[in-house]
């Protein structure tokens, strides 16, 4: 875990950071036989203590590590078709030059009284002005986990661990005009919990909230009032035909597009589908994966396909239409990661999806090209050969080596997946779904351009891992939540272009944390006026010219 950038870090953070520093020393001493298990005597007793100054320097050093980004094309044909679709949706590659920016803006102004801009022209304009400037909207003393825009971007929901081991949902509501920050804020306590919520989902209508916990429990809340102060929580009947005998963690929960069903993944390698109205389980897929199911989602607006991903390194596709015949085997499997998968997201076009993995890569998959059994076996062997824990150890070397039988369209590298289940997503429809954006263990948001295969934006502003970020469905605005307790909204500011340039950019320069925005300017203090001394004091110091000394002589 990267140490936080302040001297008041808790002792657990210091100890964890010290263990990370000791790992490389241990490897150098015994490179052929290194054991990082908890029962290792040298690991538990030989870690040096770090001072707050060393802790801060370590964090700054890790934060300055340059990631130029890299794209590997796995399927040239599918990649070409994907990029052609993007160019059709949003036009050619956006330019970042000032002349092109002003030309586009002038053209937009000239068309105000003319025909409405096409979706491709709008996407081209938005892609030229990607978010680059942060505004802090909330700060807590606990870790933030999830963030999601709802109701077409008029509201956002942020979930976090509570101050005293109680979880709560933070809902910020109010009209958004020209991507201005949300005006009001209410914090809504959750219902009955077991330890902490692991995932939070909100339907697109914004009237239903669901969260899951470390215990086999899923709750649904209905927001009945406009201010969201009173939420009625309903537990979902977890016991059914396949009752869970042991307590298990529910790592992920998602609503279907029609809000009639939710799907969950658990630590018992199973997938559960629930009916929202009846609040009961309607389908269980036992042993859906060979390890924890970290992520699930509905593939399309029809909600017939379900994607799932887990610590076995595989991404599986399930068709609900086949369940009526009792067939609960996946219709296809994607293999190619060298470690567990933390998140899966659909492009909502019934063709492409992505997966984020602990092997520090994002892979894009084509729904028409599943992996063969040889690729599945190769992935299984690679995952089983990993002996590191991403929660507190650095990523080992060798994760960049390709897996035989990998059928991914492309592989993106340039971000860090450590400490938690970091999430990656496709950008919304108003951008032509041109970009893939993800959180990062280095406190950043990394935005990849699918067409060029490069890092388009690297938004630095958090002091701890960014677990999830969400792109506004209508505006160029991204909300990010981090373990530093800060909720940040990113928008475009023409005066802050230097902040988001890649690390190796020749003209990179840095601004302050929150400068260059009008609403953040500090008022100029009027200089204090120098007080004049009284006449009597001045006369005492400097005698007047009218008085002559007694000994004056002509």
From Swiss-Prot:
Pfam family, any one: WD40
InterPro entries reported in the protein's UniProt record: DCAF, DCAF11/LEC14B, WD40/YVTN_repeat-like_dom_sf, WD40_repeat_dom_sf, WD40_rpt
NADP listed as a keyword: no
Xref: PROSITE patterns: WD_REPEATS_2 (PS50082), WD_REPEATS_REGION (PS50294)
SS bond partners: none
WD repeats: 245-284, 288-328, 336-375, 414-458, 461-500
Region Disordered, annotated ranges: 24-52, 527-554
Entry GO CC: Cul4-RING E3 ubiquitin ligase complex
SMART domains, alphabetized: WD40
GO biological process: determination of adult lifespan; proteasome-mediated ubiquitin-dependent protein catabolic process
Keywords: Repeat, WD repeat
Chain intervals with Acidic residues compositional bias: 33-43
Record family assignment: Belongs to the WD repeat LEC14B family.
PANTHER family: DDB1- AND CUL4-ASSOCIATED FACTOR 11
Function in brief: Involved in regulation of lifespan. Required for dopaminergic CEP neuron degeneration in response to Mn(2+).
Protein name as it appears in the record: DDB1- and CUL4-associated factor 11 homolog
